[in-house]
């Protein structure tokens, strides 16, 4: 028999004491709640200084300024070969530059790398017919050419994040001569019952991406956000808010929480046709891994990927499990491949303190060891008038669908008129890559362009006949 029998009077006092403590804690928490909510709303993200050096349709190519960021690197430690970060078409890229001590961009700058990033921005309804070919063989290729031209390198380093990593694989297979090294971060590449919940939900047995696009045009950000959150509903709808309440008095925790919530709620729509292609060809049919993928009739041949390849994976990534990435290294031609599986999740690869202490310095070193540089090359990247910050000014494209057939603005044409005929890149839709191909064929001016029919231009520029016809319709 117990020597301490139950004492109802003492139990009642203990219950009362505990209740008073809880009430006191709740009162103290409520006093700081409004202040903490204001703090969450005032946090800054994406603070590393950058300049927009190229624009096309909605995309902006950012060049980060280490000096303006207060990052001092000795000249002998600066790398000649730049890194182009290719972000996903989903969400905003500032998850890679969330705050100073948790910024992938800053870690690379601190290691002496010259860093660029493609910010796709949000497509309009006019962009719903953009395809993966548009994103990979037009937009990405134009951005790569700008970076090559600015750096004087014939091949650059690429770091692709998530969906941007998958697109970077496509690009590298089609343009291997322009890629020095290929880094992939949480990239979905192999979907043979290896992609976890996302692959199962995206199975053609349960889901038709075409039905979504037929209904909405572009895929709504809200639909995507809810779908991702429901993959781990307890964490996303319960646990994280309990943690927030328990740490409300910790200003640093509240600021970090606010930054993450801002990013999670800052989703963007995805161009409809590209979404359908990605889901059907990459997820449902696994064509990329099987080496069967084609973009606009061009084979995305994995045998062309023979440069150094680095894969970064999160051990606990529920969106892109490591098994959806690892097997890829076995089907490419490169004999210099490496995988790093870090003890974190999908987003943790970008923002966890441990990855910034241990992983990203190692990644920066990997790029440095393989960035010996090359002799300067002269890449013809012509543009309209240069902006004050030496940007490639294509602002007239920013709000125009890539397939639009509107006439070139007459007033702008008159203002820019000179004795020299207008170059072909003044036509909406002809970026540096297409312009270079046309120039090589002796087609330099708009007048030269008008002498050809769409079929011939398509062959010369290595594009579709419909796109070539769009160019002619503007003349």
UniProtKB/Swiss-Prot annotation:
GO biological process: poly(3-hydroxyalkanoate) biosynthetic process; poly-hydroxybutyrate biosynthetic process
EC numbers on record: 2.3.1.-
Keywords recorded for this protein, A-Z: Acyltransferase, PHA biosynthesis, PHB biosynthesis, Transferase
Reported uses of this protein in biotechnology and industry: PHB and PHBV are desirable bioplastic due to their biodegradability, biocompatibility, and mechanical properties. However, PHBV has better mechanical properties than PHB.
Record-annotated AB hydrolase-1 domain positions: 82-348
GO MF terms, alphabetically ordered: acyltransferase activity; nucleotide binding
Acidic residues composition bias: residue spans: 375-423
Biological function: Involved in the production of polyhydroxyalkonic acids (PHAs), which are water-insoluble biopolymers used as intracellular energy reserve material when cells grow under conditions of nutrient limitation. PHAs are composed primarily of 3-hydroxybutyric acid (3HB) and 3-hydroxyvaleric acid (3HV). Required for the production of poly-beta-hydroxybutyrate (PHB) and poly(beta-hydroxybutyrate-co-beta-hydroxyvalerate) (PHBV).
Subunit (UniProt): Heterodimer with PhaE.
Family label: Belongs to the PHA/PHB synthase family.
Full protein name: Poly(3-hydroxyalkanoate) polymerase subunit PhaC
Organism expressing this protein natively: Haloarcula marismortui (strain ATCC 43049 / DSM 3752 / JCM 8966 / VKM B-1809) (Halobacterium marismortui)
Gene: phaC
């Amino acid at each position: 028999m117990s020597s301490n029998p139950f004492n109802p009077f003492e139990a009642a006092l203990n219950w009362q004491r505990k209740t008073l403590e809880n009430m006191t804690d709740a009162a103290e928490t409520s006093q700081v709640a409004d202040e903490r909510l204001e703090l969450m709303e005032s946090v800054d993200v994406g603070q590393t200084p950058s300049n927009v050096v190229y624009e096309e349709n909605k995309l902006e190519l950012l060049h980060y300024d280490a000096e303006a960021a207060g990052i001092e690197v000795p000249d002998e430690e600066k790398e000649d070969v730049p890194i182009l970060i290719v972000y996903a078409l989903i969400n905003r890229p500032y998850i890679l530059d969330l705050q100073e001590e948790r910024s992938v961009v800053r870690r690379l700058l601190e290691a002496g790398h010259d860093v660029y990033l493609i910010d796709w921005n949000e497509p309009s309804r006019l962009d719903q017919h953009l395809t993966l070919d548009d994103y990979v063989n037009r937009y990405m290729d134009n951005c790569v050419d700008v970076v090559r031209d600015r750096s004087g390198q014939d091949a650059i380093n690429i770091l692709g994040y998530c969906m941007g990593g998958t697109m970077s694989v496509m690009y590298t297979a089609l343009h291997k001569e322009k890629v020095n090294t290929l880094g992939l971060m949480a990239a979905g590449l192999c979907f043979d019952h290896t992609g976890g919940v996302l692959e199962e939900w995206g199975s053609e047995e349960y889901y038709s991406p075409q039905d979504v696009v037929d209904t909405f045009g572009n895929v709504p950000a809200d639909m995507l956000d809810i779908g991702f959150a429901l993959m781990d509903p307890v964490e996303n709808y319960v646990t994280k808010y309990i943690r927030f309440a328990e740490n409300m008095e910790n200003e640093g925790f509240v600021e970090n929480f606010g930054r993450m919530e801002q990013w999670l709620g800052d989703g963007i729509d995805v161009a409809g046709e590209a979404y359908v292609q990605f889901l059907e060809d990459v997820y449902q049919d696994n064509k990329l891994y099987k080496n069967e993928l084609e973009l606009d009739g061009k084979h995305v041949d994995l045998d062309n990927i023979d440069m150094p390849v680095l894969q970064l994976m999160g051990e606990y990534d529920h969106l892109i499990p490591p098994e959806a990435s690892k097997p890829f290294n076995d089907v490419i031609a490169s004999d210099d491949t490496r995988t790093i599986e870090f003890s974190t999740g999908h987003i943790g690869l970008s923002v966890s303190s441990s990855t910034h202490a241990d992983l990203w310095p190692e990644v920066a070193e990997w790029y440095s060891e393989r960035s010996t540089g090359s002799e300067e090359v002269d890449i013809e990247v012509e543009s309209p008038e240069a902006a004050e910050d030496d940007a490639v000014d294509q602002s007239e494209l920013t709000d125009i669908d890539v397939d639009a057939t509107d006439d070139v603005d007459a007033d702008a044409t008159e203002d820019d008129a000179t004795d020299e005929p207008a170059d072909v890149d003044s036509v909406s839709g002809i970026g540096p890559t297409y312009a270079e191909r046309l120039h090589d064929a002796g087609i330099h001016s708009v007048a030269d362009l008008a002498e050809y029919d769409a079929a011939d231009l398509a062959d010369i520029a290595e594009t579709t006949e419909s796109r070539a016809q769009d160019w002619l319709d503007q003349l």
